[in-house]
Amino acid sequence: MGLSDGEWQQVLNVWGKVEADIAGHGQEVLIRLFTGHPETLEKFDKFKHLKTEAEMKASEDLKKHGTVVLTALGGILKKKGHHEAELKPLAQSHATKHKIPIKYLEFISDAIIHVLHSKHPGDFGADAQGAMTKALELFRNDIAAKYKELGFQG
């Protein structure tokens, strides 16, 4: 299920565009997640009160958290599948503290793909989308394996 060198290059090329405006991308990804899957908001005490897209766009905390999420993901993607050291603490916190189900990671992966396609259609065609989808699936599968080691049935 690994990615070829060419696929990793496509992932990292588009990720460079994300990093140019990581706060904006992170905010859009979380808004897409929360509006598409409102149940995910229940895992975020500081965002539960945000009911509309306008409220979400106005939230500096949401923008900051989007930056944290995409910064962590970028660090993992840059490891090109060799992300054990980065993944372990992330899986630990998401399994034991936050109790984030794997399904929610699928939801945010879909949100990432959607946001990248809408913001960068010229740089995120079918091949790049396929590569990013594979990279995010690899990440989720590895998180799921760590969850299992930790006894979390997320």
From Swiss-Prot:
Nitrite binds at H65. It comes from the Eukaryota. Keywords: Cytoplasm, Heme, Iron, Metal-binding, Muscle protein, Oxidoreductase, Oxygen transport, Phosphoprotein, Transport. It catalyses: Fe(III)-heme b-[protein] + nitric oxide + H2O = Fe(II)-heme b-[protein] + nitrite + 2 H(+); H2O2 + AH2 = A + 2 H2O. InterPro entries: Globin, Globin-like_sf, Myoglobin. Pfam families: Globin. Its main location: cytoplasm. Residues 2-148 form the Globin domain. The modification Phosphoserine is found at S4. One of its GO terms (cellular component) is sarcoplasm. It is an enzyme of class 1 (oxidoreductase). One of its GO terms (molecular function) is peroxidase activity. Heme b binds at H94. O2 binds at H65. Its EC number is 1.7.-.-, 1.11.1.-. It is found in: Cytoplasm, Sarcoplasm. Belongs to the globin family. Monomeric heme protein which primary function is to store oxygen and facilitate its diffusion within muscle tissues. Reversibly binds oxygen through a pentacoordinated heme iron and enables its timely and efficient release as needed during periods of heightened demand. Depending on the oxidative conditions of tissues and cells, and in addition to its ability to bind oxygen, it also has a nitrite reductase activity whereby it regulates the production of bioactive nitric oxide. Monomeric. This is Myoglobin. It comes from Equus caballus.
